[in-house]
Amino acid sequence: MAENRNSYLPKEDHERWQKALNDKGWLVPDWPVEFGGPGWSTTQKYIFDTEMANHNAPGIMPFGVRMCAPVIMKFGSDEQKQRFLPRMLSGEDWWCQGYSEPGAGSDLANVQTIGEDQGDHWLVNGQKIWTSYADKADWIFALIRTDRDAPKHKGISFLLMDMSDPGVETR
C-alpha cells in the first residue's frame, strides 16, 4: 500500500505532499464536507485511491487524518473538533498511535498504562512500544486504562496527549 512508502520520505516532504493534496481538496476523500472533506461518493473515493496507487504516489501520514480524526468526528466535543481537525488537515500537527505495550503487545485488553483523572488533566503512567513516527509526532492518541476495577475489556479510554508535555519521552 502507499502508506508503506512513507518511511523513506523526510518529514518536510510529507508536509509538502499533504499540503498539496489538502489545497486541492484531495487529502481526505472519506471525510464529510462539514469537517473539510470533499463529500465524495464511494465510487469517487475508489477511483481516486486507484489512481494514486497506479501512479505510485506517496501515501499520507495516516495516524491523524485516517485513524484519530474519525474518532474525534464521532465522539469528540465541538471544542476538540475545532481544535484538532483543521490542524490535522493542514499538517500542522503530526500524530502517532499509542496502543502496544511491553508484555501486552497488540493485545489491547492487557493495556497496563494507567490514567488518573486530576480534574483539569489526566496523569498518565506507563509505556508504549512500536509507536511509528513518535519521534516526529506532536500528538499521540493512546489507549489508557482509566478504571483499574473494570473487567479487562472495559475501563480503557482513548486519550489525546501532547508529545511535548512534561514526562513524555521517546527512545
Predicted regions and their residues:
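Amphipathic, small/basic residue-rich leader segments at the start of a protein or domain
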Residues: 1-63, 73, 79-90, 94, ...
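Conserved active-site and cofactor/substrate-binding residues in soluble primary-metabolism enzymes
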Residues: 12, 43, 66, 79, ...
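Short coil/turn connectors at secondary-structure junctions
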Residues: 24, 55-58, 90-94, 118-120, ...
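FAD-binding core of FAD-dependent oxidoreductases
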Residues: 60-69, 92-98, 128-140, 157
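Flexible, glycine-rich active-site loops centered on histidine and acidic residues
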Residues: 70-75, 97, 109
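Active-site-adjacent elements of ketosynthase-type condensing enzymes
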Residues: 103-111
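A structural signal for short hydrophobic beta-strand segments in well-ordered beta-sheet cores
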Residues: 113-116
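A short core secondary-structure module
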Residues: 121, 125-171
